[in-house]
Amino acid sequence: MVKNFLGSSVTSGSAGAEHGKTLQIPTLRWVRQSKTSIMALVICLGRIVKTALVTGGSGYFGELLSKQLLRQGTYVRVFDLNPPGFSHPNLEFLKGTILDRNAVRQALSGIDKVFHNVAQVPLAKEKDLFWSVNCGGTQIIVDESVATGIEKFVYTSSSAVFGAPKSNPVTEETEPNPAEDYGRAKLAGEIICKEAMQRDGLDVAIVRPRTVLGYGRQGVVQILFDWVERGLDIPVLGGGNNKYQFVHSDDLASACIAASNVKGFATYNIGAAEFGTMRELLQVVIKHAETGSRIKSIPMGPTALAANLASALGLSPLGPYHSLMYGRAMYFDISKAQKELGYAPRYSNSQMMIETYNWYQANRASLGKGGGSRHKAPVKQQLLALLPYALRLIPG
């Protein structure tokens, strides 16, 4: 048993079993040395220190978010199938799946804020998992958050809920129109959160990021970097003059944390403040790499059809969303987040692309050890590996 400042006794499983007596405000050193959860200390401090559950906290973004929370003095519990790739005295790991209601309930014990990041991403391609994890898993943790009385629930959604927008910039009032299963499942998660807010009063913030870049990011972007590093030609669709916005993982983490500190339901679109066209961005990384890669334009329609066919046959790592958006303009109006959250992105498209490429070059030898996260691991190029050589047939 652990007593908080108010004198009420709170049971802390391993603490009671291990010490067999009531403890008065144990020190952080005691918590580190014992097998007691760090959350026991937070309970006994009368909830002065905030506690956060980060689902998917061992994934690419979840791990960066956890680190930023820890730097701000928050106690963090990571709920994931894989352990995080770092340690910290105020970090706790709980292994489990978002589809296990009992495990989710256990993960929420003693938590103030939830950052829900677990998702099957477009690279996964397993349509059943899009729905069971992105939708069913979100329903479970939302239900249990309501039952537990969570202070704030932050849901990391996706710009994929908008599909290929008819006009830009996209605002929070733009009607969602997902074009493939990943976007539909993420939108379903948003609806679950809104319904819990309306029905049960759950305080929810929905954060929709643009495509994420930053140190440690692999996935599809690693294919681009491999081609650039080898001096191979790089494709753009329809000239590459589509304005395309990214967001740095650190800027996204800052936005999520800021959203967790604002009371009341809100939705925020998050992206870079400075960005240009896809062609301009590729020229930046090619110039930085100094490897002689050239940009070659290929037609959008036939390329998208071929890409979707290769994906359907399991011959390409790209999903439908990749081929849909690569040649289309997509960028957010971030003024709402700037006004309400004080959101001030530090990275432009060019800066984050160069940083991500530099990280890739510095860590090539250890790539492939990213654990279970698809964004922390390289992907197999499959049939896509032939594309740069086919581009040699195009003049320019």
UniProtKB/Swiss-Prot annotation:
SUPFAM superfamilies according to UniProt: NAD(P)-binding Rossmann-fold domains
Ranges that cross the membrane: none
Cofactors: NAD(+); NADP(+)
Pfam family, one: Epimerase
Keyword Transmembrane helix: no
Alphabetically ordered keywords of this record: NAD, Plasmid
InterPro entries, per database record: Epimerase_deHydtase (IPR001509), Lipid_A_modif_metabolic_enz (IPR050177), NAD(P)-bd_dom_sf (IPR036291)
Job description of the protein: Putative nucleotide sugar epimerase/dehydrogenase.
Family stated for the protein in its record: Belongs to the NAD(P)-dependent epimerase/dehydratase family.
Name assigned to this protein: Uncharacterized protein y4nG
Protein species of origin: Sinorhizobium fredii (strain NBRC 101917 / NGR234)
Lineage per the UniProt record: Bacteria, Pseudomonadati, Pseudomonadota, Alphaproteobacteria, Hyphomicrobiales
